[in-house]
């Protein structure tokens, strides 16, 4: 019997069905224009772009221009790439233009889909950013789709780390710009450390199309982008604390695997206190609960987390004496990416690796808040429906499931649940042997390096040739993925999420052609391609006859979305395929979420060793467990966002203020207002309202005026005059300080003084903002404990961070006024010293930004510039004079190797 909800859907259709139905008339309009646009010459396509641009600038809506723009873009794609967009691809493009997430399955041509809304929205002249997860994809897509945009008379740019300034500026000024999420975020932070408006890369945030949107906006959401500088080295403390931790027993701490949290018990605190005192790390008589113990307690807690929550070869690997993190979602290494708050140092101490010093934050932003800067945001992915609530609540994005061009022919089987992990892996190997014997390609998905290598050993023992794709084999990634769909191929892979390369049945024909050309460079490329394509077609047919790609997963992930991504590797473009999850009661997800109950059921059923339970009910209960984990992770991300929103409001105020200062030629009025507010504060402090003259602290005011305003005026005598009140003294101070600053401007020249005011303002804002970020970090780390006193940590954080922000503004006014009052003409020697100091500071900031971005990009792709060797200047290309030197010194090229040029 049908439920009411199911019955209603049958009658009225789902919301998704209605959205699809609404686009069909628009798609019909585009198709009706196809013949007309096919008659246009190549120049005619570009002229059409000019016409559409003019109509957009004259006020015609983009929705009205959409059919013609999409028809023009489709024709350009046919001519430039030989690819004609399907109706489903046009639908995906329409949903992207409307500011939605288009869920399109693997192999449905998302890269081409992005060209349609990108072209339409670029007609306004405000630029479009197409965002990818790594540099390889950004460069590949910009080069590939750039041909379509060139045929339409539009410019395309690509952003990459270490790019020369002039090249990067030109890329941002292109109609369509391809970039990684990391590079965009770091450029935004860098822009807000610049001194001139002309140096700013990102002039506006108009429209962004985010590829693999779930990976960027959800998996990466809690990871802030940070530009940082070195702090004090405390490696001895980490080593000393690490030596204590192996002596802990199980009753000294409580481990909660569900929430990934570990805390000391009362017995643990007593044990620690005694040990810390005995080793001289805690003064005699001082308790761990005393405010003075905050730092030591923080380091001890991080040490405990390093030992109990972070596992080698699952969360990180140790390579060449360095701790390298592993991305839990993609299984990729993240060289240079470091955990914050001393946690990374605690892991380094645990592994006896070299302990790198902690860093101080110079600027930071989360992807959640960066991408919400855009006027319009959209995204593409193969798996978004399970996270639709989060996309709607945090980003205001709807999710639309776009139908596939051909029906999915893949078979998704029910999970097979075994009692033990050994039984599960044995069953996987047996099934792999059967598939391998008939030539069916097999992809074995695992959740950690350790498990992938264990499966590899089992396959080797059985004499089955195979490839392993995990963080250790990162360099061979593209080649391994390209071969995974070949006849008889067996591939073991840690999380396949976001790999960016399709597994094509019969292998990747383009890669085969390139390999054949490399082996036989004298051959005719056309003949060679034809021969390879014929061989590929034959091999593909053999794979299809064997049943297509067989995906076996060794564990359910915490997120259904990652499971769906793994399933989606099979059955692309209507190909046949098969997927099954092999599980055991010893798996993390099963163990944490109620495997005891299932174990009793299996015992009651009298299951024998090696037998599996296969039933849709098991799938349902597992999906409920996953939904619980997803819900908890969503709540955690929401909570992080609530706190980051507080800082984000302040960040926007400061960054907007910087932009205004850079854009304003004459800041003398701003500086004068600041000076007057400082004088108001001095009067209120030393001559409080509603007090008599004999209660005024005139000596204190006299000293403060000299210190803050740089003028020596007879304040004490003024105060002694008959009938003088605080307002009179305020006016006299405003006039005296104004006259003093005008005389300075006359000495320096008005233009020089205006430049000095701008530089002092910008430098002071930057230094005060850095101090403020540190205070907010400290506040954030302790405010959670207010919950024990029945006070809401978020409200406490809002209140105190606002007070800190008010303090920042007061301190900013005071410092700017004080510094400008002390400005004087420098001798030539002093000028030389100051220039050297400024150059060193600028180099340090640039080096910090470059290191941070290199770290992030290494995490995303590990791609290096082809042929680039750091020690070989002949491989550097043509660096601009103001770029950082490619040798890695951190100096500008003109001050390093460029001096020799």
UniProtKB/Swiss-Prot annotation:
It is a peripheral membrane protein. CDD domains: DEXDc_SecA, SF2_C_secA. It is an enzyme of class 7 (translocase). GO terms for biological process: intracellular protein transmembrane transport; protein import; protein targeting; protein transport by the Sec complex. It is found in: Cell inner membrane; Cytoplasm. Gene3D superfamilies: Helical scaffold and wing domains of SecA, P-loop containing nucleotide triphosphate hydrolases, SecA, preprotein cross-linking domain. Its main location: membrane. ATP binds at residues 89, 107-111, 502. GO terms for cellular component: cell envelope Sec protein transport complex; cytosol; plasma membrane. Keywords: ATP-binding, Cell inner membrane, Cell membrane, Cytoplasm, Membrane, Metal-binding, Nucleotide-binding, Protein transport, Translocase, Translocation, Transport, Zinc. InterPro entries: Helicase_ATP-bd, Helicase_C-like, P-loop_NTPase, SEC_C_motif, SecA, SecA_CS, SecA_DEAD, SecA_motor_DEAD. Zn(2+) binds at residues 885, 887, 896-897. It catalyses: ATP + H2O + cellular proteinSide 1 = ADP + phosphate + cellular proteinSide 2. Part of the Sec protein translocase complex. Interacts with the SecYEG preprotein conducting channel. Has a central role in coupling the hydrolysis of ATP to the transfer of proteins into and across the cell membrane, serving both as a receptor for the preprotein-SecB complex and as an ATP-driven molecular motor driving the stepwise translocation of polypeptide chains across the membrane. PANTHER family: CHLOROPLAST PROTEIN-TRANSPORTING ATPASE, SECA INNER MEMBRANE COMPONENT OF SEC PROTEIN SECRETION SYSTEM. HAMAP family: SecA. Monomer and homodimer. Part of the essential Sec protein translocation apparatus which comprises SecA, SecYEG and auxiliary proteins SecDF-YajC and YidC. Belongs to the SecA family. This is Protein translocase subunit SecA 1. It comes from Ruegeria pomeroyi (strain ATCC 700808 / DSM 15171 / DSS-3). The gene is secA1.
């Amino acid at each position: 019997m049908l439920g009411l909800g199911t019955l209603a859907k049958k009658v009225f259709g789902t919301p998704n069905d209605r959205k699809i139905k609404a686009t069909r008339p628009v798609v019909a309009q585009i198709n009706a224009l196809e013949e007309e646009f096919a008659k246009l010459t190549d120049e005619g396509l570009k002229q059409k772009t000019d016409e559409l641009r003019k109509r957009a600038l004259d006020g015609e809506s983009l929705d009205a221009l959409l059919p013609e723009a999409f028809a023009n873009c489709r024709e350009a794609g046919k001519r430039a790439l030989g690819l004609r967009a399907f109706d489903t691809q046009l639908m995906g493009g329409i949903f992207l233009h409307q500011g939605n997430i288009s869920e399109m399955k693997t192999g449905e041509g998302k890269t081409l889909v992005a060209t349609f809304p990108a072209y339409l929205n670029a007609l306004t002249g405000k630029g479009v950013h197409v965002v990818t997860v790594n540099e390889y994809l950004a460069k590949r897509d910009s080069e590939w789709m750039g041909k379509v945009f060139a045929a339409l008379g539009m410019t395309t740019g690509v952003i990459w780390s270490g790019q020369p300034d002039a090249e990067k500026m030109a890329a941002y000024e292109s109609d369509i710009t391809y970039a990684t999420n990391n590079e965009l975020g770091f450029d935004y932070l860098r822009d807000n450390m610049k001194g001139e408006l002309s140096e700013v890369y990102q002039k506006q945030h108009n429209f962004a199309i985010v590829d693999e949107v779930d990976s960027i906006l959800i998996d990466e959401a809690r990871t802030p982008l940070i530009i940082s500088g070195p702090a004090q080295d405390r490696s001895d403390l980490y080593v000393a604390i690490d030596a204590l931790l192996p002596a802990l027993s199980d009753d000294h701490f409580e481990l909660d695997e569900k929430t990934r949290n570990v805390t000391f018990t009362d017995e643990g605190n007593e044990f620690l206190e005694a040990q810390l005192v005995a080793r001289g790390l805690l003064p005699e008589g001082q308790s761990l609960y005393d405010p003075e113990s905050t730092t030591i307690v923080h380091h001890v807690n991080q040490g405990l987390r390093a030992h109990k929550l972070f596992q080698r070869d699952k969360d990180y690997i140790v390579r060449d004496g360095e701790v390298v993190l592993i991305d839990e979602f993609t299984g990729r290494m993240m060289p240079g990416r470091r955990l914050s708050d001393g946690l990374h140092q605690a892991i380094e101490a645990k592994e006896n690796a070299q302990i790198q010093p902690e860093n101080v934050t110079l600027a930071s932003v989360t992807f959640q808040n960066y991408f919400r800067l855009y006027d319009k945001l959209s995204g593409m992915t193969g798996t978004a429906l399970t996270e639709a609530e989060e996309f709607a609540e945090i980003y205001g994005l709807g999710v639309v499931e776009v139908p596939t061009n051909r029906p999915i022919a893949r078979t998704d089987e029910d999970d097979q649940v075994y009692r033990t992990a050994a039984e599960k892996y044995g069953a996987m190997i047996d099934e792999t042997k059967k598939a391998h014997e008939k030539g069916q390609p097999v992809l074995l998905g695992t959740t950690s390096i350790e498990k992938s290598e264990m499966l590899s050993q089992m396959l080797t023992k059985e004499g089955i040739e195979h490839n392993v794709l995990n963080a250790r084999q990162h360099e061979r990634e593209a080649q391994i993925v390209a071969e995974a769909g070949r006849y008889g191929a067996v591939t073991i892979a840690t999380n396949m999420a976001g790999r960016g390369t399709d597994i094509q049945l019969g292998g990747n024909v383009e890669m085969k052609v390139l390999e054949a050309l490399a082996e036989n460079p004298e051959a005719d490329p056309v003949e060679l391609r034809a021969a390879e394509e014929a061989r590929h077609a034959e091999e593909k047919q053999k794979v299809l006859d064997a049943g297509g790609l067989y995906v076996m997963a060794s564990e359910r992930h915490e997120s259904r979305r990652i499971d769906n991504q793994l399933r989606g590797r099979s059955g692309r473009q209507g190909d046949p395929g098969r997927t099954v999850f092999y599980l055991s009661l010893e798996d993390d997800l099963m163990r944490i979420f109620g495997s005891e109950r299932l174990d009793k059921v299996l015992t009651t059923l009298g299951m024998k060793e090696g037998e599996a339970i296969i039933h849709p009910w098991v799938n349902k209960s597992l999906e409920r467990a996953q939904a619980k984990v997803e819900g908890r992770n969503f709540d955690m991300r929401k909570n992080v966002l609530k706190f980051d929103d507080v800082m984000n409001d302040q960040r926007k105020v400061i960054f907007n203020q910087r932009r205004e200062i850079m854009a304003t030629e004459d800041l003398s009025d701003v500086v004068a207002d600041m000076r007057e507010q400082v004088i108001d504060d001095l009067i209120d402090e030393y001559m409080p309202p509603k007090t008599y003259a004999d209660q005024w602290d005139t000596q204190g005011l006299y000293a403060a005026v000299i210190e803050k305003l740089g003028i020596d005026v007879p304040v004490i005598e003024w105060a002694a005059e008959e009938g003088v009140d605080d307002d009179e003294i305020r006016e006299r101070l405003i006039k005296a300080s104004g006259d003093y600053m005008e005389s300075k401007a006359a000495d320096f020249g008005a233009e020089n003084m205006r430049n000095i005011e701008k530089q002092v303002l910008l430098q002071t804002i930057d230094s005060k903002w850095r101090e403020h970020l540190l205070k907010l970090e400290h506040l954030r780390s302790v405010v959670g404990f207010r919950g024990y006193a029945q006070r809401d940590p978020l409200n406490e954080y809002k209140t105190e961070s606002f007070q800190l922000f008010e303090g920042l503004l007061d301190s900013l006014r005071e410092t700017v006024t004080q510094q400008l009052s002390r400005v004087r003409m420098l001798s030539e020697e002093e000028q030389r010293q100051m220039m050297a100091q400024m150059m060193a500071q600028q180099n340090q900031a640039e080096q910090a930004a470059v290191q941070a971005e290199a770290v992030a990009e290494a995490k995303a792709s590990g791609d290096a510039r082809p042929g680039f060797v750091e020690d070989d200047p002949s491989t550097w290309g043509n660096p601009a004079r103001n770029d950082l030197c490619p040798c890695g010194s951190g100096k500008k090229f003109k001050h390093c190797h460029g001096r020799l040029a």
